[in-house]
Amino acid sequence: MTEPQREFTEDAFLGGQLRLRQPRSGHRAGHDAMLLAAATPAQSGDRVVDFGAGIGAAGLAVARRVAGIRLVLVEIDAALTDLARGNASANAIVAETIVLDVSAGAEAFATAGLAPDSADVVLMNPPFNDPARHRVSPDKAREIAHVATAATLENWIHAARRTLKSGGVLTLIWRADGLAEVLAALDRGFGSLAILPVHGEPTSPAIRVIIRAIKGGKAPTRLYAALMLNDEKAAPNKQVQEILAGKGVLLGVP
């Protein structure tokens, strides 16, 4: 007799350095989370806050690369937060988990232990599908994870600006056709931008942008050469494969 299909899967990331339990259906962690983590700088002792952490994939990937960070995983969905907590424990990573709507405001953040000017690094993969152009999923968790309201991006960036110390780093991944929205939101309080377009293949337009910004930064914006997920023959890009195996970084991360 065959075993009934399980509600969850356990998947290997970073070449097996990280094993994460996640729902079989709904929003699932994948390439975006690992690319975001690879572009996020951190040092031992830094307080690193992952907004919209889901099962914890991006934040835990940073913690696997940089030992000794003080990781905080923030997620609105209590069930996903439980998975994130379990994933941290299963991978022997110390992480604080908080059930919180990133758009909730300063008072809710302070109550949850996220005071203003308290983080060295914030990373985030906000819901980014335009509801006007995206068919809403009947899966509520998937809808929350993928579909943005008009104010989602601005609210999340405002929360990052409030939470970060002066000179703190924000790294985010967003859809490429929404680059103008990101730049407009970052124009208030952030600078020293580094921008990396991500393409599915060399002949196609970018599908994602990864952006790193510094709170109060004054340096000129840097536009990096595009990252191709696949080459002209649709074969996986070697650099991307190294990143997914936990052997590479992006945007000059040390």
Report each predicted region and the residues it spans.
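Class I SAM-dependent transferase core
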Residues: 2-43
